[in-house]
From Swiss-Prot:
One of its GO terms (molecular function) is RNA polymerase II cis-regulatory region sequence-specific DNA binding. GO terms for biological process: anterior/posterior pattern specification. The gene is hoxb5a. CDD domains: homeodomain. It comes from Takifugu rubripes. It comes from the Eukaryota. Its main location: nucleus. Residues 244-303 bind DNA. A motif (Antp-type hexapeptide) lies at residues 226-231. This is Homeobox protein Hox-B5a. The keyword GTP-binding does not apply.
Length: 319
């Protein structure tokens, strides 16, 4: 659960088997006022004294009979595979207890699936908590070294103690980035609101929404595909070349044929006819006007050469 950080007992304390831990997950008399005593008070500084846990009805209060100072330590049986949260939340509902009870060799993914399974009644966990989940691969261990009196715990029971809703306020953002990533991969990428680690929330995306967003980004990164029918038949918008001069217009075979037919009937066009041809051939009026000017110059040049060629042999026969 939230506020119970995922701190491996065996990783933090190499001589973990030396400590005598009661398995609160077992169905024994330890549930009704069982005590937790540490056999090595000299080395384990934050778990000294005896603790009594009274479970009567929906009362989830923790009675601390210790007179010393320091942080509270609530540690379930790490080596026995029990779970304190399973007993604290599911003592009135066997389905909840079964869903929270995990073997010692469970993985993070299976633990997350059991916590989010519908068999846990109306228990709402994890998705609305503001701190990392308390499942750990390899054990049902729950350790809290930063639980103080200012922790906000709101419990509401329903259905004869069948479901409880607990919301914890995170007091210490001591979880590492690797634990966050493993937790995200375990429970399907559901966004967990975090106040201290906002960048962790940004990395989480929903399944369908994340896939759709990825596809959108990929489509935006690729240039749009241009089909042949999307291209114009000519280049009319770019009138300047690389050297600042007007770009040479490349007329298509159809455009040239239509212009030649029009020039054959009318060497000079009116403005109205020029607009009609421009719309019919997808050209501008300026291009039509320039083409007719060039065509008239070529026609005059051809006529001049033809007249000169006809006049030269005639002059040779003159006396």
């Amino acid at each position: 659960m939230s506020s119970y950080f995922v701190n491996s007992f065996s990783g933090r304390y190499p001589n973990g088997p030396d400590y005598q831990l009661l398995n609160y997950g077992a169905s024994s008399g330890a549930l009704n006022g069982g005590t937790y005593r540490d056999s090595s008070t000299a080395t384990m500084h934050h778990a000294t004294g005896s603790y009594g846990y009274t479970y009567n009805g929906m009362d989830l209060t923790v009675n601390n009979r210790r007179g010393g100072s320091g942080d509270d330590a609530v540690t379930s049986g790490h080596f026995g595979g029990g779970s304190l949260v399973g007993d604290a939340l599911g003592f009135g509902s066997p389905t909840t207890e079964r869903s929270f009870r995990q073997p010692s060799s469970c993985s993070l993914a299976s633990a997350a699936e059991s916590l989010l399974s519908p068999g846990s009644g109306d228990t709402s966990l994890g998705a609305r908590s503001s701190s990392p989940r308390s499942e750990q691969s390899g054990s049902g261990n729950l350790s809290s070294t930063n639980l103080s009196s200012s922790t906000n715990i709101s419990s509401s029971g329903g259905g004869g103690g069948g479901g409880t809703v607990q919301r914890f306020t995170e007091l210490d953002d001591a979880s590492t980035e690797s634990e966050e990533l493993r937790r995200d991969n375990g429970h399907g990428g559901n966004p967990v609101p975090r106040t201290g680690h906002s960048h962790g929330v940004q990395k989480q995306e929903g399944g369908p929404a994340g896939a759709a967003a990825g596809n959108t980004v990929g489509s935006e990164g690729q240039p749009p595909q241009i089909f042949p029918w999307m291209r114009k038949l000519h280049i009319s918008h770019d009138m300047t070349g690389p050297d600042g001069k007007r770009a040479r217009t490349a007329y298509t075979r159809y455009q040239t044929l239509e212009l030649e037919k029009e020039f054959h009937f009318n060497r000079y066009l009116t403005r109205r006819r020029r607009i009609e041809i421009a719309h019919a051939l997808c050209l501008t009026e300026r291009q039509i006007k320039i083409w007719f000017q060039n065509r008239r110059m070529k026609w005059k040049k051809d006529n001049k050469l033809k007249s000169m060629s006809l006049a030269t042999p005639g002059s040779a026969f003159q006396p």
